[in-house]
């Protein structure tokens, strides 16, 4: 019986692909070696311990319909589009060894005519007249009896968009958590004009087969029908949830301030697991009562634009004379936390 398994996703949904990865990883026999190939449409993927409000321009992402996906491995934030090819290698212990999967990817690149080297813990780089340029980044996860190595290969990614989403607004945000390190990157199309996702997948697959001396047929994973994977529906629901993607952020504090025609406002939030644990409101408004009431309404709310906006508007019934001010405040607050 073969010990290899090859899976290829035809979905561009990051939550679907990460849920597939998680399910395969949890249920694979310890004797199996798995290669999973996939790619995502416009997505910022953050590490397990990262804070999306600190790492990303969440407002710009929402405007441009870019998804946020939190992965189960550590490391930094990356932007995925269809110019990235994603790979995941899985194996049971003691056989799991990320140097083996790194060797397979390097062999695949070599077969395409690209000489790359491993650099540091996570990157593959190519030498250019301008110095080393990163063409692949990776992250890893291990449990007691198994491990995986997943990463991306930059084929024809829109590198100009990296800065759009991975540079957060200059918010007054004091946050804990892992900060991403920006690297100089290059697309493989600069070295191999016309290279395609399919060609790269084929090269990685052949290198995978060659290393283990076996061949297997590919299993195509599609969202058109629920994959036959244990607990997939529950895993997908969690992977796509606000509670996982945003709510798992490390604790942080956020200060918002604005001056309106009716007075200045400062909001101080402490946020844990995506929920406001403390809210303070300061104002020089001549009628501070609605704002004092707002602090109590916000405590315990999810740190979401729509939730905060609704909490503010809910005070209109209690303070109808300040309807205009409360609507203005609600709109500003929703925009400020996006």
UniProtKB/Swiss-Prot annotation:
<dbReference type="Pfam" id="PF21948">
    <property type="entry name" value="LplA-B_cat"/>
</dbReference>
<comment type="similarity">
    <text>Belongs to the LplA family.</text>
</comment>
<dbReference type="GO" id="GO:0005829">
    <property type="term" value="C:cytosol"/>
</dbReference>
<dbReference type="InterPro" id="IPR019491">
    <property type="entry name" value="Lipoate_protein_ligase_C"/>
</dbReference>
<protein>
    <recommendedName>
        <fullName>Lipoate-protein ligase A</fullName>
        <ecNumber>6.3.1.20</ecNumber>
    </recommendedName>
</protein>
<comment type="subunit">
    <text>Monomer.</text>
</comment>
<dbReference type="InterPro" id="IPR004562">
    <property type="entry name" value="LipoylTrfase_LipoateP_Ligase"/>
</dbReference>
<comment type="pathway">
    <text>Protein modification; protein lipoylation via exogenous pathway; protein N(6)-(lipoyl)lysine from lipoate: step 2/2.</text>
</comment>
<keyword id="KW-0963">Cytoplasm</keyword>
<dbReference type="InterPro" id="IPR045864">
    <property type="entry name" value="aa-tRNA-synth_II/BPL/LPL"/>
</dbReference>
<dbReference type="InterPro" id="IPR023741">
    <property type="entry name" value="Lipoate_ligase_A"/>
</dbReference>
<keyword id="KW-0436">Ligase</keyword>
<keyword id="KW-0547">Nucleotide-binding</keyword>
<feature type="binding site">
    <location>
        <position position="134"/>
    </location>
    <ligand>
        <name>ATP</name>
    </ligand>
</feature>
<feature type="binding site">
    <location>
        <position position="71"/>
    </location>
    <ligand>
        <name>ATP</name>
    </ligand>
</feature>
<feature type="binding site">
    <location>
        <position position="134"/>
    </location>
    <ligand>
        <name>(R)-lipoate</name>
    </ligand>
</feature>
<comment type="pathway">
    <text>Protein modification; protein lipoylation via exogenous pathway; protein N(6)-(lipoyl)lysine from lipoate: step 1/2.</text>
</comment>
<dbReference type="Pfam" id="PF10437">
    <property type="entry name" value="Lip_prot_lig_C"/>
</dbReference>
<dbReference type="GO" id="GO:0005524">
    <property type="term" value="F:ATP binding"/>
</dbReference>
<dbReference type="GO" id="GO:0016979">
    <property type="term" value="F:lipoate-protein ligase activity"/>
</dbReference>
<comment type="function">
    <text>Catalyzes both the ATP-dependent activation of exogenously supplied lipoate to lipoyl-AMP and the transfer of the activated lipoyl onto the lipoyl domains of lipoate-dependent enzymes.</text>
</comment>
<dbReference type="GO" id="GO:0036211">
    <property type="term" value="P:protein modification process"/>
</dbReference>
<dbReference type="GO" id="GO:0017118">
    <property type="term" value="F:lipoyltransferase activity"/>
</dbReference>
<keyword id="KW-0067">ATP-binding</keyword>
<dbReference type="InterPro" id="IPR004143">
    <property type="entry name" value="BPL_LPL_catalytic"/>
</dbReference>
<feature type="binding site">
    <location>
        <begin position="76"/>
        <end position="79"/>
    </location>
    <ligand>
        <name>ATP</name>
    </ligand>
</feature>
<feature type="domain" description="BPL/LPL catalytic">
    <location>
        <begin position="29"/>
        <end position="216"/>
    </location>
</feature>
């Amino acid at each position: 019986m073969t010990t290899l398994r090859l899976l290829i996703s035809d979905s561009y949904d990051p939550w679907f692909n990460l849920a597939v990865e998680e399910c395969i990883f949890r249920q694979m026999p310890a004797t199996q070696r798995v290669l999973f190939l996939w790619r995502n449409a416009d997505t910022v993927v953050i590490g397990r311990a990262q804070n999306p409000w600190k790492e990303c321009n969440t407002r710009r992402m929402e405007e441009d319909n870019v998804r946020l996906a939190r992965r189960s491995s550590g490391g930094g934030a990356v932007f995925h589009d269809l110019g990235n090819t994603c790979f995941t290698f899985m194996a049971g212990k003691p056989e799991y060894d990320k140097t083996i999967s790194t060797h397979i990817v390097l062999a695949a690149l070599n077969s395409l005519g690209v000489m790359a080297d491993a650099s540091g813990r996570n990157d593959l780089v190519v030498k250019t007249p301008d110095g080393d340029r990163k063409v692949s980044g990776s992250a890893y996860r291990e449990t007691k009896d198994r491990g995986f190595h997943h990463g991306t290969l930059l084929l024809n990614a829109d590198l100009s968009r990296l800065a759009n989403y991975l540079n957060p607004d200059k918010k007054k945000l004091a946050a804990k958590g892992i900060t991403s390190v920006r690297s100089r990157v290059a697309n493989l199309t600069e070295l191999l004009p016309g290279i395609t996702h399919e060609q790269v997948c084929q090269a990685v697959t052949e290198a995978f087969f060659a290393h283990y001396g076996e061949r297997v047929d590919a299993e195509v994973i599609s969202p058109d029908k629920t994959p036959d994977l244990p607990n997939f529906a529950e895993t997908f629901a969690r992977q796509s949830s606000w509670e996982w993607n945003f709510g798992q952020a490390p604790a942080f504090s956020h200060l918002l301030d604005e001056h309106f025609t009716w007075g200045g406002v400062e909001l101080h939030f402490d946020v844990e697991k995506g929920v406001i644990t403390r809210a303070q409101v300061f104002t020089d408004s001549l009628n501070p009562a609605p704002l004092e009431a707002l602090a109590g309404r916000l405590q315990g709310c999810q740190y979401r634009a729509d939730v905060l906006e609704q909490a503010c508007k809910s005070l209109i019934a209690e303070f109808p004379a300040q309807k205009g001010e409360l609507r203005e405040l609600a709109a500003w607050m929703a925009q400020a936390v996006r």
